[in-house]
Amino acid sequence: MKEIIGIGNALVDALYLIENEDIIKEFGLEKGGMHLIGENIFEQVCERMRAAKRERTTGGSACNTVLALAQLGAPVGLIGKINDDENGRFFEDSFRQAGVRTFLMKDAQPTGTASTFITPDGQRTFVTYLGAAALLQASEVASQWLDGYSYIYIEGYLVQSHDLIEAVVEAAKARGVKVCVDLASYNIVAAERDFFARLLRKTDIVFANEEEARAFTGLEP
């Protein structure tokens, strides 16, 4: 079986079943929307929800893909960045227990967390703090980590760091590792279309849904 290594935002998902919309209104959130927040608001959310019951899982696009492949028995690895905090240890332990070979850098910023507030009507409101995940640098990724792998899976959400993606692709090409890119989301593709156009010229396999393909090509299916 071909070996696959993924690189992406290492996140922990925290799901909360809430009885009303108080916290959504308190933080000025759009119900049903996705919101990126900074450390200050993240700390306030954590304090506000400290006593609430939550369901915690690992998250992140590439991370979810790698974990699913591991559960199917594929030999896989994962590159990302976390903090040595409770969420970071939970994240790392979860992947190691699944048999994933991890290359996880550590940062002083808290481990990235995606909080989901689910109201009684089933609507989900997302609040994401990228934290340490967004601080992975090209200089921290050792090219030899790719040795022995046939494919590298790169999530489009890493587009905040062009240098990181370009360095990883260059290292992969030098080692004969095939490059797989997930376009992540149509709005990210639209905002970074020129970069994706350059990236896909060096990509062997592209994962995109209908909306992402439309955003990239400008064409209807």
Spans of model-derived segments:
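Ribokinase/PfkB-type carbohydrate-kinase core domain
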Residues: 1-31, 54, 83, 89-107, ...
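Glycine-rich phosphate/adenosyl-contacting loop at the front of the ribokinase-like
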Residues: 1-77
